Amino acid sequence: MAVFVCARCDAVLTGSVERVALPVCAHQKYGHDLLPALMESGTYAVDPEPAGPPWRPWSEVGAEEAEARGVFAPEFSLSFGAPGAVVVAPGDTRGTVLIPERCDGYCIGLDGRAGPNLACACCGSAVATRIDDCSYWQAVWLTPGAVRRVPDDGPEHAMTDWEALAEQHQGAPPIESCGAWNARWEAAVGAALAHLLSVSAGARVALPDGVMEETFGRALDALLPPGPTRRRVVLAGPGLPPADEDIALVPRHPRTGEVWRPPGGTAAVPLEADVWLHMAFPCAQLPVPVTGGMPEGVFRDDPLPPYPWRLFRPDREVFLSTLARLPAVREPWLRGIYDRMRDAPYACPF
């Protein structure tokens, strides 16, 4: 556990928080609704990539310098700000005040366009950026260099082992009560889709029927050329029986970010743990009580399970950002997919 303090005056800026993996949806933009908090209360994550100004266009950066930073396909621009921004839930901040002249946003909240908009209440130093505008996950991003991490005496949670993953973490339902697809699912599948394409070698893959086909199938049909399926994708991970297949969809540990490794030479495609858990261990509604039966003349009036009002669509921006950071994107067939998707933002094939 740790707290973050002002680097200038040592005032405490957060409650006691524990480090977890950065969610793949951290920089996702979704619809025009207010989104909930990105981070669970009592947790923080670190973004290893540079963030914020100055920005340099791709034409100025060049492929060689970009590859040295782990970006293997063109992006509009790259940040040359400081890496290591820390993100916490808004409710975990302490001793900060808004900077009124920096409280700009696109719609009905703050989006950080004017730079850090939270100051230390003790010394006035700009220390963080509050994000709560529509389309963004609500979060507070602590500015690298303006804050300092201090170990805390709070209880340290034991690192979750793989075998206890299903017991200590819950799966996220794919569909919201309103019938919209869960934004975290769209981001998670978008990131996993990039990895799945990179290990497919450009050949069609077979998916099991059900939620995997519903979430990955349309995108793979649109992006891979027609032809016979050469490889099969299955769910694999802790709590599931061993599967002898070519490609395994495996969980990414929610605390460490470690990817579960299947035995042998099976290619692993990482998927966010909350999405993987729902795919691997779906919670089905029981048709009758666990014990006994329904009394005579009594009918169930439970609401029907939510049904989506549109087809599933992996998040395009998360997909492209993930694909640009995979060395395999330099292969001509995969680079062609990336270029087609990037150059036609309003003509998404799936």
Residue ranges and their predicted role:
Residues A243-F350:
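Extended, amphipathic alpha-helical scaffolds
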Residues E60-A63, E167, E186, G190, ...:
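Intrinsically disordered, low-complexity regulatory segments enriched
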Residues P50-P53, E176, A180, L271, ...:
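Alpha-helical structural elements
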Residues P54-P57, D161, A180, R184, ...:
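Residues in intrinsically disordered, low-complexity segments of regulatory proteins
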Residues M1-Y106, L110, E317-F350:
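An N-terminus-focused feature that recognizes amino-terminal "leader" regions
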Residues P74, G81-A82, R102-G265, V269-L271:
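Domain-exit/linker segments immediately C-terminal to small folded modules
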Residues V3-V5, V12, V17-V20, V24, ...:
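Extended aliphatic helical segments
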